[in-house]
Amino acid sequence: MTDFQYATDQDTIAAQATAPGRGGVGIIRLSGPKSLAIAKQIIGFEPKPRYAHYVPFKTTGQEQLDEGIALYFPGPNSFTGEDVFELQGHGGPVIMDMLLSHCVALGARLARPGEFSERAFMNDKMDLTQAEAIADLIDSTSEQAAKCALRSLQGAFSKRVDELVEALIHLRIYVEAAIDFPEEEIDFIGDGKVAAELAGIQAKLAEVLKEANQGALIREGMNVVIAGRPNAGKSSLLNALSGKESAIVTNIEGTTRDVLREHIHLDGMPLHIIDTAGLRDSPDEVERIGIQRAWDEISKADRILMMVDSQSIDSKDPNEIWPEFMEKLGDTKHLTLVRNKVDLTKEGTGIETVSGVPVVSLSAKTGEGVTDLTEHLKAVMGFDSTTEGGFIARRRHIEALNKANRFLDAGNEQLHGYGAGELLAEDLKEAQQALSEITGAFTSDDLLGRIFGSFCIGK
């Protein structure tokens, strides 16, 4: 038995389940084998299961610490699957500390971050995606993110993954039976059954991957860096996108010397906009530091908006406009050229592609064409705001789905290219394990520790 499992099986844990600070109500939560014994010492009697008792909370010396509601949920019919006891008192930090300290003195220990959800997972009350959805629901920054996290908590994502795993198990049984019992003369390579089922699984996996990418965008959003020479209108575009005066706008070059950040939502997708210092050779040490930070942000961006002043530049080819920038940037797959100030040139707004780079013409000052840009940003990230019934997803989920797909691609090659049944069976097994990592059916203790360690203490 690992240390991870031992702590889960033996200890009674306690933590404040409500946010730290002052509030009308504060909750202390316990889970584990000593919960009932601790409950009896604090309220003076054995609580009725799933019943709200309004009682004083006392020490063993009968000193009253607070009064409020006491709730007892005997396992396995509780959130964690263990005996759970809650004290719902007044939400002052001193009162919460007194109650929590008393619970520890009576035999509980302080819970690790996410340990209540961890125990729920270990006791099969939920799978890993549902446990993660609790944290995502708490941390959601938009209505759409909250709805998607709730659907994941209710099992929408898990169901899709479980269906894929079941299909793989069914296919593995057929393939491995043909290998292990050659006397049955099952020609799984020639009969087309395996090929058809494998194609069906990959098609369903592609659908889940598309939905998961949507869920990851809703959860994490995209980082958009606005870059360009001084006075190209970068700060004006930041203000236009954020809908407020986030940055100072003047005609003086070098006004923006550091990185400015704003966070908005585009139809539910978080957009992290980063305005940077104008890129140029500068004798000013402070400005040079800002320019280096700008390049640091460019290297990490999901999308780079290269801002140019359309008054001084006729070309729409980024290689002609700024060859030095393009050479330093290298890969242009994340680049969009933004031609600003079209209200002055009267050239019109819109989107086109030049030398493989999208070009958006707009006016950050008047707002003309800004909607074209926001629609473009959603499109390049593959975000579909019309999708209904989606679920929340994380980067690790995307990686696991892609990993499973790579094994299925390899299995396809073994089937059609070499007729290698044993190698196909191994690839199917690896794909199944990759998918099982998502729900936690096949997951290392180290990964579990990292996931639950990112949770709130009382969750």
Swiss-Prot record:
Does the keyword field hold Metal-binding?
Answer: yes
**Which InterPro entries does its entry note?**
G_TrmE (IPR031168), GTP-bd (IPR006073), GTP-bd_TrmE_N (IPR018948), GTPase_MnmE (IPR004520), MnmE_dom2 (IPR027368), MnmE_helical (IPR025867), P-loop_NTPase (IPR027417), Small_GTP-bd (IPR005225)
Transcription regulation found in the keyword field: no
Query: Which cofactors must be present for this protein to function?
Result: K(+)
Q: Which SUPFAM superfamilies match?
A: P-loop containing nucleoside triphosphate hydrolases, TrmE connector domain
Cofactor binding, per record:
Binds 1 potassium ion per subunit.
EC no.? Answer: 3.6.-.-
- Per UniProt, Mg(2+) binds at 235, 256
Which terms under GO biological process does the entry name? Answer: tRNA methylation; tRNA wobble uridine modification
A GO molecular function annotation here is:
GTPase activity
Q: What class of enzyme is it?
A: hydrolase
Keywords assigned by UniProt, alphabetized:
Cytoplasm, GTP-binding, Hydrolase, Magnesium, Metal-binding, Nucleotide-binding, Potassium, tRNA processing
Q: What does this protein do?
A: Exhibits a very high intrinsic GTPase hydrolysis rate. Involved in the addition of a carboxymethylaminomethyl (cmnm) group at the wobble position (U34) of certain tRNAs, forming tRNA-cmnm(5)s(2)U34.
Q: How does it assemble?
A: Homodimer. Heterotetramer of two MnmE and two MnmG subunits.
NCBIfam families with a match to the protein in the record: mnmE_trmE_thdF (TIGR00450), PRK05291.1-3 (NF003661), small_GTP (TIGR00231)
Protein name in the entry:
tRNA modification GTPase MnmE
Name of the gene: mnmE
